[in-house]
């Protein structure tokens, strides 16, 4: 059996988030990852997904203030108009995912969606830059409801609260159909898989308790069993995307890999278990 090309790898020591004044050294080309989905983020750290609904555009996350010009450039490059962004869906409140919101809303007047849990954290950070994480000002207009999908054009997006990396991380599931082939693909974007804040000594950083770590493990293992055709990670390293881009950047079928979602989530669950060996005996002597 050939080696799996998509797998979790640790973040690079220096990526765009640590070098926001050096975009040329940390750029990633625009690529298509679903029939009507592209990563327009333009840098080697946080993904920004553009969904063409046929009735306007949806963005999942916005990246950094310093890279938002690449998002706008890539949207134009695809032949779309940034003014047609209707909804901005935020996986969580951390600055590397939300700091482009204000600029994009200024252009488009789009709705801004976030979980209620992370809006509370957003307000705490916006007042004091708590814990050293800068969050640029923006206004949330809508809150996710896991019982009510977000519908626009061809897309019906299911949301699921998946706390851990932040209290209000939200995961997205949606189907995307290729009209030329008739094939429909189930796609997923996890809301946040960084696990440093789930260490016993770091939980307070995100105002969380030990239960957050154990819920993260349970959620990852449960969601890993959901069939997903195309895994769209929120950071490129979570599926080693930037080292595995296709020669044809328009060939989204390159990313069809039914193992990628499952393996990524199991990897993160097992990593968190190691922080809590007294709870997970299989790691007691590791």
Language model segments and positions:
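Metallo-beta-lactamase
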Residues: 8-20, 25-27, 32-35, 64-66, 116-248, 252-255, ...
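Structural recognition of the beta-strand scaffold that forms the well-ordered cores
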Residues: 39, 50, 58-60, 86-90, ...
